[in-house]
Amino acid sequence: MQIHALMLADSAQAVDGKLYILGGAWNVLRFPEFPAQLLVGIAVAIDVDWNETNRRHHLDVHFEDADGNKMDPTIGADFEAGRPPGAVAGADLRIVFAVNGPLAIPGPGSYSAVASIGGEELARSRFQAVQASRSN
């Protein structure tokens, strides 16, 4: 099993096996002051190996600061990829997830969204939070 995509966005939706992303793939956020609050969309696409289908798995996504300290929120989801009629034997099956919610950024620095399945880290999306310069 592997994570095909882990993307941070302004908004994300998962509909009919597709991810819809608005304002995605950013890696630098500018804030006039800290602590800062934003709404973040998290989009995840998972390729499930044929031999791992028809079994329950658990996805966890959490945020970390540069020192590896976990931050709220932590998001979890159980999933199972079933083999649909007509699926090619041996082919991976893709599962998509999207969630939107608040994220508090305590100060300038480096942060990561970390995705794990069954306790194994499979993807990391890094970003920087910087102080926006004030215009006169």
Enumerate the language-model features and the residues they cover.
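Contiguous segments within soluble domain cores/interaction surfaces
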Residues: 2-117, 121-136
